[in-house]
């Protein structure tokens, strides 16, 4: 059981790091063309390439890496995303567990909203995201 908990924690840490990198703005840096490389950046609607200085942090080496890390198609975000993950009531529950602030996609306002999660599901478990950024990536119409 401890091994499973450790694995889940490791996955959560990697996911959080990936989300942060997806949201980093592209920085050009200052270098001549001979020191530039192409990296891929998430733009909110997909991954696009851009020339950057070779020592620039952020971005992905390939379009596939960017897609895997930053889009629903890459499987990084809630697998129920799309119509199922971006609709219905969030899983508020009332199990008496510790209250945790999470985000869900409100299909009426087409925005990501907060809700109090209490450790069990009484709504759509796919419409629950740990961060607002994760919700906006999974439900693109939230950020447009």
From Swiss-Prot:
Reported modifications of this chain: The N-terminus is blocked.
Residues recorded as bearing Pyrrolidone carboxylic acid in the entry: 17
Linker, as annotated region: 74-85
GO biological process, one term: envenomation resulting in negative regulation of voltage-gated potassium channel activity in another organism
Region forming the signal peptide: 1-16
Pfam families the record matches: Kunitz_BPTI
MF annotations from Gene Ontology: serine-type endopeptidase inhibitor activity; toxin activity
Protein's name according to its UniProt entry: Monobin
């Amino acid at each position: 059981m401890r091994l499973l908990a450790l694995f889940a924690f490791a996955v959560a840490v990697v996911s959080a790091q990936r989300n942060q990198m997806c949201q980093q703005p592209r920085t050009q840096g200052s270098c001549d063309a001979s020191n530039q490389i192409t990296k891929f950046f998430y733009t909110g609607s997909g991954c696009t390439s851009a020339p950057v200085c070779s020592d620039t942090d952020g971005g992905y080496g390939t379009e596939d890496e960017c897609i895997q890390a930053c889009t629903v198609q890459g499987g990084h975000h809630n697998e129920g995303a799309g119509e199922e993950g971006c609709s219905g009531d969030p899983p508020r529950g009332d199990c008496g567990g510790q209250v945790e602030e999470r985000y869900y996609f409100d299909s009426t306002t087409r925005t990501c909203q907060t809700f109090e999660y209490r450790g069990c599901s009484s709504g759509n478990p796919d419409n629950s995201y740990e961060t607002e950024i994760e919700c906006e990536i999974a439900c693109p119409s939230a950020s447009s």
